[in-house]
From Swiss-Prot:
One MF annotation (Gene Ontology) recorded for this entry: metal ion binding
EC number: 4.98.1.1
Chain's gene name: hemH
Function: Catalyzes the ferrous insertion into protoporphyrin IX.
Protein name, as recorded: Ferrochelatase
Amino acid sequence: MRQTKTGILLANLGTPDAPTPEAVKRYLKQFLSDRRVVDTSRLLWWPLLRGVILPLRSPRVAKLYASVWMEDGSPLMVYSRQQQQALAQRLPDTPVALGMSYGSPSLESAVDELLAEHVDHIVVLPLYPQFSCSTVGAVWDELARILARKRSIPGISFIRDYADNHDYINALANSVRASFAKHGESDLLLLSYHGIPQRYADEGDDYPQRCRTTTRELASALGMAPEKVMMTFQSRFGREPWLMPYTDETLKMLGEKGVGHIQVMCPGFAADCLETLEEIAEQNREVFLGAGGKKYEYIPALNATPEHIEMMANLVAAYR
């Protein structure tokens, strides 16, 4: 019997190719055109997106990207490539490809790369620890569209999420411990997750429950009292209500109440990006300190640390 050859597809959101208004506009157009991200009626959404949002937001967002851009590209791309390369070294007999839902490299190019290696089974690992229809669901949809155009398709194992995975929780806990050792234990550990519209959760997206699961498991692993750990949601967009409490409003409130020392971690981000390095590490730091807080540290994402790569290797091993 012929032995199955397995490949691994690491999937993430994506990033502009450059910190310029033109590149950001291309990226945002693709991202905000996905019904999984914005499900507003197209008759209403297209004119708003093309006539207002893209022209106004692209130059401003490009400046934010420029503030965190690295020598080799955007942080998300740099760290994602490092993850791909490190996992390939950890699993030398298994092809590992990287694909993004939006921008380059695309999910289609990643699938084609693996098929060119003659794999007949692909393990898809969306690097979103907590499932949401707007992230993991978007990967699923695009993968289905890609394979629908193939005459022959490989076997697919799709990892829905890993919110309570033991190795993932331990890696997060060790990052927190390292930060406490360096900066001292903070008055409060704030866990900031990317938000989604509240309506999505009301309609069945179990993302908030998966975030609560990670928060509970991490607090338990650290042996921290519940009142010392807080969960919030960031990066809201548009006018409708999103999951609460909001990170920026919470940090302002905590500073005003006299909480002196905060450390913030973003467990839902597998790699540092604009939302962590600029929004959390810079913007929200200013919010907290401006409201009266004294000390604020951002705990980096797991990125391509050895623990994170080992977690990925162990996670996909069950499906190989």
